[in-house]
C-alpha cells in the first residue's frame, strides 16, 4: 500500500511539474488573439505585473510567472511602457516581451484637406504603418476603383451611401489621434471612421455622398471658412447649368500632383476626376473635409456669381461673367 501511495504521489508530482513546465515554457499563444495595449508602470513588482497579465488573459498562473521571473532573472530586464501581448502566452514568452522596449504612443495630426495619400504618408512618417500600400489595402487607392472589406462596410452603416467600388476617400476624419507605433492599418482606419461617425454622421441632416464630395472640393479650393458656403453654391449652380466645374484641385487629385497651377497636359488627363474634361462631380471626394466645409456644402449661401478664383494669398475673387473672370485671372494669377 505504501508503495502504491508513493507511486501515486510521484505521478502527481511529475504531472504537476510537467504542467508547470508547459505553462512556463511550452504553451503556445493564440495565433490571432491580441490584447488591448497594457501599460507596465515604473516600479511595478513582479506580483503586480503577473496580476495585470493574468487579468488580461496573457498568462494563466501568477505563481508560475513569478517563479520563472525569479529563476531566470528576467525581472531585472523589464521595461516600463505600453505592450501588446498575444493571449495565452507561456510565462517565459511573456517575460521576453517585457524585456523589449514597450510601444510608444504617438500623437498624429491629420489636417483638414488631407487625402488618402497624404494620410498614408503622414502615418508612415510617424512609423504607425509600414507603407502607403498598407493603408490602401483597407481604404482603396486615390482616383481608382476599390473593393472595401464587407465587414468594414457592415460595421459602419454610413458607408452604405457610397458607391460599391468607391474608396474610403473623404471618410477618414481629420483630427489629432494617438496611435501606438506600429499599429495595423485596419485599426487606424476604424479609429478614424469612429471619429467620422461621432462628428459627421450624427449631423442633422447628415451629408449624403454627393454632399461629401462637394465638401471635399470646397475644402481644397478655398481656405477661408467665410468663402466656403458661397463657393458651394457656385459649384451647385454650375452643375445645374451643365457647366464643367473646371477645378485644378480635381486635376491634381487625378495626377497625384500638388501644383498651384496645373499644366496643359494635366488638364487633358483622361480621368473621371478631371472636372475640366468630365462634367458634374468627380466620382469620389478628393480629400477629407472638415466640419466647416461639410456645413458649407449642407447649407450653401445663395449668390449671383458663377466664377471664382483663389489668389496665392488665399483671397477669393468672385465674378459673374466669364469676361470678368478672365480679367481677374490676368490680374491676380500672373
Regions found by a protein language model. Give the residues of each.
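Signal peptide-directed extracytoplasmic domains
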Residues: 22-199
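A broad, low-specificity signal for short, low-complexity segments enriched in glycine/proline
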Residues: 2, 42-47, 67-71, 266-271, ...
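N-terminal type II signal-anchor transmembrane helix
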Residues: 1-35
Amino acid at each position: 500500500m505504501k508503495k502504491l501511495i508513493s507511486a501515486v504521489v510521484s505521478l502527481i508530482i511529475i504531472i504537476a511539474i510537467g504542467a508547470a513546465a508547459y505553462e512556463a515554457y511550452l504553451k503556445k499563444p493564440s495565433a490571432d488573439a491580441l490584447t488591448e495595449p497594457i501599460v507596465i508602470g515604473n516600479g511595478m513588482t513582479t506580483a503586480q505585473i503577473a496580476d495585470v497579465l493574468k487579468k488580461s488573459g496573457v498568462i494563466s498562473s501568477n505563481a508560475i510567472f513569478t517563479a520563472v521571473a525569479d529563476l531566470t532573472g528576467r525581472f531585472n530586464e523589464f521595461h516600463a511602457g505600453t505592450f501588446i501581448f498575444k493571449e495565452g502566452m507561456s510565462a517565459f514568452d511573456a517575460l521576453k516581451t517585457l524585456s523589449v522596449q514597450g510601444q510608444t504612443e504617438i500623437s498624429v495630426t491629420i489636417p483638414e484637406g488631407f487625402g488618402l495619400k497624404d494620410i498614408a504618408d503622414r502615418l508612415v512618417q510617424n512609423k504607425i504603418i509600414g507603407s502607403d500600400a498598407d493603408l490602401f489595402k483597407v481604404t482603396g487607392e486615390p482616383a481608382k476603383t476599390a473593393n472595401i472589406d464587407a465587414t468594414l462596410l457592415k460595421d459602419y452603416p454610413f458607408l452604405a451611401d457610397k458607391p460599391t467600388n468607391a474608396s474610403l476617400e473623404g471618410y477618414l476624419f481629420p483630427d489629432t489621434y494617438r496611435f501606438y507605433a506600429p499599429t495595423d492599418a485596419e485599426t487606424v482606419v476604424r479609429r478614424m471612421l469612429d471619429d467620422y461617425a461621432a462628428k459627421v454622421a450624427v449631423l442633422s441632416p447628415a451629408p449624403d455622398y454627393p454632399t461629401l464630395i462637394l465638401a471635399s472640393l470646397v475644402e481644397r479650393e478655398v481656405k477661408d471658412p467665410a468663402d466656403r458656403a458661397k463657393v458651394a453654391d457656385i459649384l451647385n449652380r454650375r452643375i445645374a447649368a451643365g457647366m464643367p466645374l473646371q477645378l485644378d484641385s480635381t486635376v491634381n487629385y487625378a495626377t497625384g500632383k500638388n501644383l498651384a497651377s496645373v499644366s496643359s497636359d494635366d488638364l487633358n488627363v483622361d480621368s473621371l476626376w478631371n472636372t475640366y474634361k468630365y462634367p458634374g462631380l468627380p466620382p469620389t471626394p478628393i480629400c477629407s473635409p472638415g466640419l466647416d466645409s461639410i456645413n458649407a456644402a449642407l447649407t450653401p449661401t445663395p449668390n449671383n456669381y458663377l466664377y471664382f478664383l483663389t489668389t496665392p494669398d488665399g483671397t477669393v475673387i468672385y465674378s459673374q461673367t466669364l469676361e470678368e473672370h478672365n480679367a481677374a485671372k490676368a490680374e491676380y494669377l500672373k
